């Protein structure tokens, strides 16, 4: 997304009185190593949310891990190795597996409009792309994104990154994070697990 789109989403979230003091969107401009060092050390959770099989493996998630931030993510890239080290019960995994994504791509069987019409929260979010919520009343600003999610005007297949398919699973993972965070001792233990040598290395 362009910087303009990110700022528009931030403006909506940051001016929502219902979540004032609880949630804020901050767009980090000129992202570089010096900024990253602060973020890695300060993060409570490392969100690595690329669609399984779609993302080249990077090192950012490892740096969050070494600073004690539990992983919320898909089984993609280096997340697979992190989960292998800490145990799946100590991570917050969501979404399709790589094989499931590949099967849908090769054999079909996924229609994002089914998700859209059967999950009112997802429908509400997608509809907001067109009702001007995030674009100061401009109903056409996000039309390409809207079309790419629900029809084939922009791509050969709709929702090629399975965003709508993974969304409910992502929301459920966020709830698991919230529940785990309320257990202060358990959360601290999990954070220490992420920073310590893995059992495989200490045998």
List PLM regions with ranges.
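Single conserved hydrophobic/aromatic residue that forms the stacking wall/gate
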Residues: 1, 5, 197, 201-203
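Short acidic alpha-helix that forms the nucleotide-activated donor recognition element
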Residues: 34-42
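Nucleotide-activated donor-binding/catalytic signature segment of Leloir-type glycosyltransferases, i.e.
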Residues: 3-33
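N-terminal Rossmann-like NAD(P)+-binding subdomain of aldehyde/semialdehyde dehydrogenases
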Residues: 2, 190-191
């Amino acid at each position: 997304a362009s910087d303009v789109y990110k700022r528009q989403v931030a403006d909506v979230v940051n001016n929502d009185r219902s979540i004032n003091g609880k949630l804020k969107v901050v767009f980090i401009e000129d992202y570089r190593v010096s900024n990253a060092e602060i973020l890695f050390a300060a993060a409570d959770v490392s969100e690595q949310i690329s669609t399984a099989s779609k993302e080249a493996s990077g090192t950012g998630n490892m740096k969050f891990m070494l600073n004690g931030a539990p992983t919320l993510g898909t089984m993609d890239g280096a997340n697979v190795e992190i989960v292998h080290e800490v145990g799946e019960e100590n991570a917050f995994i969501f979404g399709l597996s790589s094989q499931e994504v590949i099967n849908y791509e090769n054999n079909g069987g996924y229609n994002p409009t089914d998700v859209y019409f059967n999950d009112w929260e997802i429908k509400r979010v997608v509809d907001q792309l067109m009702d001007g919520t995030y674009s100061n009343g401009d109903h056409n600003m996000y039309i390409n994104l809207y079309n790419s999610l629900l029809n084939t005007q922009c791509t050969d297949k709709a929702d090629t990154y399975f965003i709508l398919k993974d969304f409910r699973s992502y929301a459920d993972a966020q709830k698991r994070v919230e529940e785990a965070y309320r257990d202060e001792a358990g959360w601290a233990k999990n954070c220490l697990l992420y920073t310590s040598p893995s059992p495989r290395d200490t045998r």
